[in-house]
């Protein structure tokens, strides 16, 4: 994770924000007399929040992990996005 000082972040706030957005990577901002903070794009933040929400339920987390294991062991089926969107909902 890229790390910059509070002073550098303040002097280059717009460029620092653009870097976080373009690189899809958080930036650690340190302070001499306080806790550090992390700057990240709204897209990255929303992604973390969604992941946390999906993993909050132990049953859902287990289903997701089982699906990942299934794909890693070659049991997955590749589909085009159109096929996936057109799947019936029950």
UniProtKB/Swiss-Prot annotation:
A Pfam family this chain is assigned to: PhdYeFM_antitox
Keyword Transcription regulation applies: yes
Entry keyword annotation includes Transcription regulation: yes
GO molecular function: DNA binding
UniProt keyword list: DNA-binding, Repressor, Toxin-antitoxin system, Transcription, Transcription regulation
InterPro entries on file: Antitoxin_Phd/YefM (IPR006442), phD/YefM_antitoxin (IPR051405), YefM-like_sf (IPR036165)
Family designation: Belongs to the phD/YefM antitoxin family.
Role according to the record: Antitoxin component of a type II toxin-antitoxin (TA) system. Antitoxin that counteracts the effect of the YoeB mRNA interferase. YefM binds to the promoter region of the yefM-yeoB operon to repress transcription, YeoB acts as a corepressor.
Subunit record text: Forms a complex with YoeB which inhibits its toxin activity.
Protein name, entry field: Antitoxin YefM
Native source organism of the sequence: Shigella flexneri
Lineage of the species this protein comes from: Bacteria, Pseudomonadati, Pseudomonadota, Gammaproteobacteria, Enterobacterales
Gene: yefM
């Amino acid at each position: 994770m890229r790390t910059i000082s509070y002073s550098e972040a303040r002097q280059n706030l717009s460029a620092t924000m653009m870097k976080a957005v373009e690189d899809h990577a958080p930036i650690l901002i340190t302070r001499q007399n306080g806790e550090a903070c992390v700057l990240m794009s709204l897209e990255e933040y929303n992604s973390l929040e969604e992941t946390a929400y999906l993993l909050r339920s132990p049953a859902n987390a287990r289903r997701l992990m089982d699906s990942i294991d299934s794909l890693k062991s070659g049991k997955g089926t590749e589909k085009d996005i159109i096929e996936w969107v057109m799947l019936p909902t029950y």
